[in-house]
């Protein structure tokens, strides 16, 4: 089984940046406790304060699928969606 890595880049509306960061920090902490989560970091680029990155590592695709399909994920997306200008996710296999 291959380890799965995801980098998610969010462009956040300035007036919601602090709310978004706090929401993602809580999400990261909860995600780290999930079975199969090997890494879940919230990164704040120094050169662009409108962006927030998530870097995730999962044991395998099955662990990522459980995380992605959890009911809490739908609620999380519903909460932050109005705060975003853009979102880009890149999935990678880490061998």
Kindly give the residue locations of the regions a language model identified:
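Short, well-ordered beta-strand segments in beta-rich or mixed alpha/beta enzyme
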Residues: 4-11, 41-68
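Short phosphate-engaging motifs
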Residues: 16, 50, 72
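Histidine-centered active-site/metal-ligand motif
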Residues: 27, 67, 72
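Short linear/disordered segments characteristic of secreted peptide precursors
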Residues: 13-14, 83
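Acidic-histidine catalytic/liganding microenvironments
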Residues: 31-35, 61, 70
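Glycine-rich beta-strand-turn "strand-cap" elements at beta-sheet edges
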Residues: 2, 41-50, 76-95
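Alpha-helical elements of the RecA-like P-loop NTPase motor core of helicases
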Residues: 18, 62-65, 74
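Short amphipathic alpha-helical segments
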Residues: 16-38, 76, 80
